[in-house]
């Protein structure tokens, strides 16, 4: 186990994030999950995040990542959820049909 360090401390901070699709709808397949992972990998360096593991099922995603103590996890999650939602709905229009019904 290799520890990370900065000027005054040594640390090893792992986070396990589980993101669940609204109403547990069956949205994720391999292609959509791969694109969501690409988006996470694009955003993560800006927050000093290193992706360790990525798993998915049809209605959720498990993300294991390493972070630094000064990382604002809430801002990372907010940024990722906003960007991934916008981009995935744009690139995969079938997602909108699974999340929204035509009646009210």
Model-derived features: positions:
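Basic nucleic-acid-binding interfaces
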Residues: 1-104
């Amino acid at each position: 186990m290799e520890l990370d360090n900065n000027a005054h401390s040594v640390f090893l901070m792992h986070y396990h994030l589980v993101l669940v699709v609204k109403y547990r709808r069956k949205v994720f397949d391999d292609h959509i999950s791969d694109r969501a992972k690409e988006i996470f990998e694009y955003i993560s360096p800006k927050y000093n995040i290193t992706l360790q593991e990525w798993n998915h099922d049809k209605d959720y995603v498990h993300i294991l990542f390493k972070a630094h103590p000064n990382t604002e996890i809430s801002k990372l999650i907010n940024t990722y959820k906003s960007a991934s939602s916008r981009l995935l709905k744009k690139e995969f229009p079938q997602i909108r049909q699974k999340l929204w019904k035509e009646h009210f």
